[in-house]
Every structure is written in C-alpha cells, then in structure tokens.
C-alpha cells in the first residue's frame, strides 16, 4: 500500500510540474518545484515571477529560498507573512531597486542573480534566479540512464545507499549520464566513479540519512559525496544534495563521527559541479584534498549558522569551501551561506606539496566568520596565485583574511574588485586581518595585491597587517583604489589599518 501511495504521489507531482511548466513557458519563466519532503516557507508564503507562482522552500536551518529560471526581463514579487517595515535586498552593488507595499516586495531582474533578502526580523530568504538549462538530459536519450530503471524509487523513508551506489558503478562503467528524476532518494555515503555524469533534475533530492552508521569513517572522516581517486566526473542539474548535517550532529551530540562533509575529493582531477543546491553539511561543506582541475559553477550552498539557529547547542564549523593541498580550482557564479569561513584556502591534508591557482570569483557570500581567506591550516610548502575577484560579501566578521600560521610561504595572493556590505557580528570585526603567526611553524607572505575593493563602512575594530619577526615579514603589500565609507583611502592611518614593524614595502595608489 505504501508503494502505491508513493507512486500516486509522484504521478501527481509530475502532472502538476508539467502543468506549471506549460503556463510558465509562455512567460519565459521556469519554476523549479520543491522536492518531496521539503516544506513551504511560511515566513515567505508566496513568490511570483511575471505572475507565475514559484515554490518557496523552508529548511531545517531556519532560512528559506525560491528557485527558478528565466529569460528576458521579469518582475519578482515576494510576499512576507507580515507588513514590511524594513528590508534589505543584497547584493547592493547590483543596484536592483525594490519597492514594498504592505507585505509585498517587488523588483525586476534582467539577468541571472542570486539574491539575499532580509525583511523586518524574519529569517533570511534567498532568491536563486538562474538562466535556463541548456540541453538537459532526458530519459530515453542515448547514454542517459534513469535511476528508476535500477530498482530505485522515490521514498521518504527507505535508505537506498547500496542500490544507488550499484547504479553509479554501472553507469560510470558505460561513461554515461545517471538521470535522477524528481523525487527523494535517501542515502549514506556515495562514491563517484570516473566517467560519471550525475544529473539531478529539478525536484530531485539526494538526502542524507541523519544516521552516523550510514557513513563509514575513514582516516579523513565521513562524507556524503566522495570523489576518491577519480577523474572526469560531472555533478549537475537543478536538484538538491542535502547532507542532513544538523540531524547528524544532534544524533551524536556533536561527536567527530557526525561532522560529515557534503562533498569531499581526494586525488580527484577534471571534475565539475554545476547548478545544484548543496544543503546542510555536518561541518566543512566542500573539502578538496590533493586534487586538481576542479570547477564549481552556479552552485547554491546553504549550511547551518549560529545566527540563524541560536538554539543549536554547539559552535558550528560549517565552512563553505576548503581547497586543501589542491591546484587549478575555480569556484564561480555561486552563493555561499555558512557559519564558518566562506572559503579558506588550506594546505593541511594529503601528501603535502606546493599548491597554485585557486580562483574564487563572481560569488555572493554570507558568513558569520571570514569571507575571503587563506589559512589557518597552511603548512610548510608554497601557496601561490590565489585570486578572489568580483565577489559580493553581504555579511562577514572579517572580509580579507590571511592567517599564515604554520610555516607556509604564501606568494602573490590577490583580492580584486570585491564588495563588502557588512563587517561585524562576531569575535574580531575587522575589514581586513593579514598576519603571520607561529602556530607550529613560521611562514612568509609576499607580494599581496588588494585592488579595487570597496567596504561600505569602517569595521568596528581596526584592520590588522602584522608580520611575525625580522625574518618572517610581510613583504610587498599594494592597496590600489581601496574605498572605505565612500572615500578612497591613501594610507594605513586613513584606512584604519594597524601595521607592525615586520611589514615591508606598503604602497597606496
């Protein structure tokens, strides 16, 4: 009986999706449906785009979102559950003008955007407005394999790890596309294999189990999706991967076993993650170890935060991205909401070697901790050519950060054309903190470029630029067109930056 009910539910879901799609196609709007098991957002019960209804989604993390694709110019209307007295629509630099009327907020979009909305004291809400997918795979096409043909069905309750893993192995051996249709597929750890494309259709969700026993613990810990010793893997689509990290941490009272990464790579090459929503990691969301030639594009990453969920009993280490001992990594056109560092470039795990060429660009960031960071765990070897460019930082405790703590030599890092709206709300409250410190090793930092960066205001505490000693100095720091509080700043004093005696060759221009 349960299986019959589930089949009927899926058919109804598919019918409603098709009906909405036909209506929306006439308006150039593609609504993406809530996945089974997800609940509507009661704080924002309605979103309409060109008068087409878009599903709103509530999450266990006390934030919500709506997701759609569009072409041309569209009008977005968001309905809140109460009269709008104050609102803040970010990123500010996009210059999108919004109007409030009663409990309705309206604005227009002419290109894909990821928007952060705060209304009154309501929980935060996100608008994920994508471009339409180009040639998404369809069941029945050559090389496309439907998950349902492998005895895997949508189920709110069934744990299907082994069946899904066998399907992955089979499709990867054929270098095919595994099509995950709309529905909920609950699973423990899944290992990707070389040659696989994993496609999550709109309305599809791979959801963790919330049970530690479903995640075998290795030397590096546990993970939901594992790219281990593989190459040429694609994870794409407009569906969701949800790690159930909050439930995992509650289930074991925050034990090490519950700190499950959402995606971990180890010795992976030539892999792409594109378009999907990534939700609820147990700790660092994306940990990339000893890997190369990786790309994350148009992702949407949402992890638990202590500001959204103050009743959570443990401090959260929910970093967004941690490229670690890896090279040639591009993270772009995405959205990060997390409690710990949005990105922290590290050199800690794997067989340590020098790392080079990490690019974090065109992203929207909201974090409780550091926004654009190198460190803390950087050991012994060289880290070169790390670039943070064209990012919109909505909220952070620190904006530009280098913690050269454990002996690494960091060379030629760049922060170019980033915009910072709010800095504060946590322990340090600094626009910038760049320093060398002996925490198991004495490092070096050379040739820092901070160009065309804008901070809307001064941070509550002074920024900091501190070398360690007469040998372990920060050498060569260029501030080019640094704007704070509406004015170009031309000296450390003017920019409210504390500089110690172990910094050489600072210039402003």
Positions of the model-derived regions?
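Bacterial N-terminal signal peptides that target proteins for export
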Residues: 1-9
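Extracellular/periplasmic carbohydrate-active domains that bind, remodel
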Residues: 11, 19-509
């Amino acid at each position: 009986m349960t299986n019959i009910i589930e089949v009927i539910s899926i058919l109804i879901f598919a019918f409603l999706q098709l009906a909405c799609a036909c209506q929306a196609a006439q308006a150039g709007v593609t609504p993406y449906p809530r996945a089974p098991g997800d609940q509507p957002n009661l704080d924002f019960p309605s979103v309409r785009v060109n008068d087409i209804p878009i599903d709103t989604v509530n999450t266990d993390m006390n934030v919500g979102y709506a997701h759609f694709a569009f072409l041309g110019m569209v009008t977005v209307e968001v309905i809140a559950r109460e009269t709008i007295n104050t609102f803040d629509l970010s990123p500010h630099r996009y210059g999108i003008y919004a109007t409030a009327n009663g409990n309705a907020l309206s604005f227009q979009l002419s290109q894909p955007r990821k928007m952060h909305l705060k209304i009154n004291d309501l929980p935060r809400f996100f608008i994920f407005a994508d471009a339409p997918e180009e040639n998404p795979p369809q069941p029945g096409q050559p090389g496309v394999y439907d998950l349902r043909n492998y005895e895997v069905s949508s189920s709110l309750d069934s744990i299907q790890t082994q069946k899904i893993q066998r399907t992955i192995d089979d499709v990867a051996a054929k270098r095919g596309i595994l099509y995950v249709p709309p529905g909920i597929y609950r699973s423990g750890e899944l290992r990707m294999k070389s040659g696989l494309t994993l496609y999550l259709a709109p309305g599809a969700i791979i959801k963790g189990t919330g049970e530690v026993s479903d995640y075998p613990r290795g030397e590096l810990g546990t993970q939901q999706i594992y790219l281990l010793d593989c190459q040429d893997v694609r994870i794409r689509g407009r569906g969701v991967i949800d790690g159930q990290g909050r439930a995992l941490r509650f289930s074991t009272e925050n034990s090490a076993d519950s700190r499950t990464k959402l995606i971990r790579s180890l010795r992976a090459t030539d892999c792409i993650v594109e378009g999907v929503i990534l939700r609820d990691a147990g700790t660092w969301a994306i940990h990339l170890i000893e890997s190369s030639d990786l790309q994350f594009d148009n992702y949407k990453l949402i992890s638990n935060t202590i500001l959204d969920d103050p009743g959570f009993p443990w401090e959260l280490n929910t970093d967004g991205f941690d490229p670690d001992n890896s090279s040639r990594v591009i993270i772009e056109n995405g959205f990060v909401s997390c409690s710990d560092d949005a990105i922290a470039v590290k050199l800690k795990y794997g067989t340590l070697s020098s790392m080079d060429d990490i690019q974090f660009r065109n992203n929207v960031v909201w974090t409780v901790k550091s926004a654009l960071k190198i460190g803390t765990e950087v050991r012994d070897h060289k880290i070169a050519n790390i670039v943070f460019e064209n990012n919109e930082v909505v909220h952070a405790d620190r904006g530009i950060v280098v913690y050269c703590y454990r002996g690494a030599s960091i060379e030629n890092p760049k922060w170019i054309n980033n915009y910072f709206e709010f800095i504060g709300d946590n322990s340090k409250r600094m626009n910038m903190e760049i320093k060398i410190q002996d925490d198991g090793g004495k490092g070096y930092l050379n040739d820092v470029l901070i160009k065309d960066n804008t901070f809307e205001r001064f941070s509550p505490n002074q920024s900091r630029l501190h070398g360690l000693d007469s040998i372990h100095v920060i050498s060569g720091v260029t501030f080019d067109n640094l704007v704070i509080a509406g004015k170009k700043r031309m000296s450390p004093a003017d920019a409210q930056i504390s500089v110690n005696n172990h910094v050489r060759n600072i210039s402003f221009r």
